Amino acid sequence: MSLLTRITTYSAKPALAGAWGVVTYGELGALIGRAQQSLAQLKLDRPTAFGLIGEHGPASTAWLIALAERGHFVAPLSGNAAEHPAKLALINAQWIIATSDIGWQLLPRVDEPSTHPLFTQLSDQGSAGLVLFSSGTSATPKAMVQDFSKLVASYESRHESDLVMLALLGFDHIGGLNTLFNSLAAGSLLVIPLSRSPADVASAVARHRVAVLPASPTFLNLLLAAGVTAELASLRVITYGTEPMPESLLLRLKAAFPRVRFIQTFGTSETGITRTSSPEAGSTFLRFDDPDLEWKVIDDELWLRSRTQIAGYLNASNERFTADGWFRTGDKVEQGPGGTLRILGRLGEMINVGGEKLMPAEVESVVLSVPGVTDCRVRGEPHPLTGQTVVVDVVATASDHEALRSAIRAACRERLARHKIPTRVNFTCAVSGERFKKTRWIR
């Protein structure tokens, strides 16, 4: 059953909740019909590139489905069009759809259609196209082109469910789209909080009795620090991904939410979100349970090949893909028993201290276990003798920083090899959450 057919079938059920109130599947279906009528009035004689501007909401969802159904190309972009001139130019968007809750404006941009070979390839296959951009935190954002028709079809086997879900990642990320399409295919209610602050998320969970919360370990740590666990009593499942989960944080989370099932997820923008399972409760290992995915480990790096991986990049080479379609993720992994894996971190984040290598996540797990530490980031800094040295930036609730610094060093000396012990402990108000955003998303 197609996604659009499912939406029609679920007519009376609530579909999307947010600042606009609650929209039913029937009302969402009517919005999709209006969007399709607007497309018909344009009298387009070929697949066309659209920039879809906005955030999660009824209008943006309606247009995503309408464009996929009609075989067009779409780049979902958060914010407003003025923020994305380079991205709109790169896809040569002929039209801009500026959405806001349940309304939209359809604005012409250029007359000439896009002639990029990847768009032509998808058009020849009769497929719609989806363009997602990498975060671009360290370079120009990469424009990744996906077979949108194939991606949407991958959700057609989902079972109906009444579990209420919450969306944290935006509709311009593969993780945010995965949450959206999973919810729509299951006929569930998807809740969009007013903001991604712990307070607003907790308020949305309490108001709509959210049962499933997809989040990153960093955000889950912020929830604990915010003291809002009492408002999260309705939660039954927390899925986590985007970065390694420190074992010490997982233990704290399980103590704070004893009735919640924790599921580790994994995915990349290039290969999509993968179905996974955990070998046992509380384990930081995962197992891939996806018939559409192949995986292998080469020199401790995870390689993936999936049925829904991207067709290519608009503005970059495919050097991270092998000739036979394997994607080199850049993730360092540890292999466990029974085909399980543990994500240790990004290979590019590895710290080399005098020839001894370590991953930041191992040190972060120890530092986070120290009472008074609410968050931390471990990084390498240049050192004239050892090449690099370990530094940790700490967010703390404790006011006595010297005592906490001593406690952190004592914990590290007790549990870590000498080369892994931070040589400097800095205290700060906040730490960057950008380190892992490039390739991994939650569902």
Regions found by a protein language model. Give the residues of each.
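Conserved AMP-binding/adenylation subdomain of ANL enzymes
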Residues: 152-164, 172-211
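Conserved ATP/PPi-binding loop(s) of AMP-dependent carboxylate-activating enzymes
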Residues: 296-324, 356-358
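Conserved AMP-binding A3 loop
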Residues: 24-26, 128-156
